Regions:
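RNase H-like nuclease module associated with reverse transcription
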Residues: 2, 20, 38-159
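RNase H-like nuclease fold core
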Residues: 5-48
């Protein structure tokens, strides 16, 4: 049993301030146990940056969630890395490679904490196809069928 994270971002969703939307959730034993949808505090210059900022925020929450569930005895060990799924290849590359990329030099240093988590083996950032990114409904409206599919993947049951 392990906690798995899903992260997504919608770029430039607010026409007034040009900020993006972050969404992430964590699933344990087939049920969403923690989630968040919020406007980012910075103006991202690209979709990749918005996704990277979201992944960084999710990684901090994910490590707390992992430690919390271990302390409760739900998960036996914190030694295995937590998997966080992201649908943006550029954001995944930024998280995995602790070197400066030409198009990401402007990203604020505080978001590079995810690189440290990956380097230490606390987190593994993996690619998920956008159609299977369970965090999608936390960042944008979806067609009903897709929304219901994601709710089912979250373990949410309609009564």
């Amino acid at each position: 049993m392990a906690v798995k994270g899903y992260v997504d971002a919608s770029f430039n969703t607010d026409p007034d301030d040009s900020k993006s939307q972050t969404g992430y959730l964590f699933i344990l034993n087939g049920v969403a146990v923690s989630w968040r949808s919020s406007k980012q505090s910075i103006v991202a210059a690209s979709t990749c940056e918005a996704e990277y900022v979201a992944a960084s925020e999710a990684s901090r929450e994910g490590l707390w969630m992992k430690a919390f569930t271990t302390d409760l005895g739900v998960i036996p060990s914190t030694l295995d890395p937590m998997e966080i799924y992201c649908d943006n290849t550029g954001a995944i590359a930024n998280a995995r490679e602790p070197r400066s990329h030409k198009n990401s030099k402007h990203i604020q240093l505080r978001y590079h904490i995810i690189r440290e988590y990956v380097k230490k083996g606390d987190i593994v950032v993996s690619k998920v196809h956008t159609d299977h990114n369970v965090a999608d409904p936390l960042t944008k409206p979806l067609p009903q069928e897709k929304h219901e599919k994601h709710l089912e993947a979250m373990g949410v049951k309609m009564l």
